[in-house]
Amino acid sequence: GRPGGQQVLLAHATGFHARCWDQVVAKLPPDWQIFAVDMRGHGRSSNSQPFTWEQFGDDLLRVCEHLKLKDAIGVGHSMGGHCITHVTGHNAAFFKHLVLVDPVIFDPELYSAKREQASMSVEDHPVAKRRNYFASVNEMLERFSDRMPYKVWQREVFEDYCQYGLLPVADGEGYELACPGYVEASIYLGNFDANLYQLIRNIEVPAVVL
């Protein structure tokens, strides 16, 4: 986009990556300045612990500070919606509008129930056992193309998800998930301590929740 144009920050869901937004970006005005972020453990960012929800929110807060956002449009999907909310609760000057797509913000009573998940180890979580290796991008495309939810996705979005969601194996042939199963499982098990309600009280920015 064009520096000085309307700023937009796009934050992806758990297990996704910044390039999942490519088809959305293509439909936005070409003179807007658009930023899409790979959260830690996703895309081209490093798999550096901790994978806590507060840490993801703080990471995005630092990104906003580095980019010097002001009156941007903040768009977040799932975990990304949580993080956009976290950032806005700390500094509302970054955004003038929020678009939160299925944001991970639970009913207050559910946070106590979520704490019970802490007894499950990452290794025992079903997501941690997900296949991590693929011989090619096409193999991943073929494996998931007829499965939910991927089979109802726009084809171009699904192709972006696969193409940019894999990294070359460091010590061999083939590809591995940029967001390995153990990282995704760690995030799901960490949502019990992600109570945003103190920050939400600070937010007066107009928001659309989908």
Residue ranges, per PLM feature:
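Conserved HGGG/HGGXW glycine-rich cap/lid loop of the alpha/beta-hydrolase fold
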Residues: 1-49
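Structural signature of beta-strand start/N-cap positions in the alpha/beta core
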Residues: 7, 31-33, 70-73, 94-97, ...
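The conserved SAM/SAH-binding core of class I Rossmann-like methyltransferase domains
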Residues: 9, 35-37, 77, 101, ...
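Short, hydrophobic alpha-helix immediately C-terminal to the catalytic nucleophile
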Residues: 22, 61, 85-89
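Active-site loop/oxyanion-hole signature of alpha/beta-hydrolase fold enzymes
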Residues: 23, 35, 39-79
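Conserved hydrolase catalytic core segment
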Residues: 70-115
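The alpha/beta-hydrolase serine catalytic core
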Residues: 115-150
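Conserved serine/cysteine hydrolase catalytic core
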Residues: 156, 166-210
